[in-house]
Amino acid sequence: MSLLIDFIDETEEVKEEYMSLIREVLEKAAQMESIEDGAEVSVTFVDNERIREINRDYRDKDQPTDVISFAMEEMGEGEMEIVGAEMPRMLGDLIISIPRAKEQAEEYGHSFDRELGFLALHGFLHLLGYDHMTEEDEKEMFGRQKEILEAFGLGR
């Protein structure tokens, strides 16, 4: 299983070991979700101010959040599907707030590693079409998150 992950660290605080952890968690998720080899995702680490700007500009919520996902496969109104015979599948972009991840790890009483793995996985599942807008969808998404985290060894 080979997922291509492009990391961008705007905070200059993210250690290589954290990127390796995220790579391993997302590889496990891709395997469990039967995502084809060569699919691509980008992961950008930002501070609270930057994620607040993105949240405001794209989601009309003027506050910082922990993770934002931009799925490349979601069709917008009036967009045409572009089919590339030999192009790898681009799943989308994940944007993770490092300060928020640290705050939440402390708040929930678990490690920063676990929180970072959780946030990356949560965003990744959104890229795959999972959501939690309804109670039924939430149950499905959170159940799948739990399965993958436990299979990886990051369960609670």
Swiss-Prot record:
Compartments where found: Cytoplasm
PROSITE patterns the UniProt entry points to: UPF0054 (PS01306)
Cofactor (UniProt): Zn(2+)
Entry GO terms, CC: cytoplasm
Pfam families per record: YbeY
Keywords: Cytoplasm, Endonuclease, Hydrolase, Metal-binding, Nuclease, Ribosome biogenesis, rRNA processing, Zinc
Transmembrane intervals: none
Cofactor note: Binds 1 zinc ion.
InterPro entries: MetalPrtase_cat_dom_sf_prd (IPR023091), YbeY (IPR002036), YbeY_CS (IPR020549)
Chief location category: cytoplasm
Molecular function GO terms recorded: metalloendopeptidase activity; RNA endonuclease activity; zinc ion binding
Entry's Gene Ontology BP terms: rRNA processing
Residues bound to Zn(2+): 122, 126, 132
Keyword Hydrolase attached: yes
Disulfide bonds, paired cysteine numbers: none
EC number: 3.1.-.-
Stated role: Single strand-specific metallo-endoribonuclease involved in late-stage 70S ribosome quality control and in maturation of the 3' terminus of the 16S rRNA.
PANTHER family: ENDORIBONUCLEASE YBEY, CHLOROPLASTIC
Similarity annotation: Belongs to the endoribonuclease YbeY family.
Protein name: Endoribonuclease YbeY
Gene label: ybeY
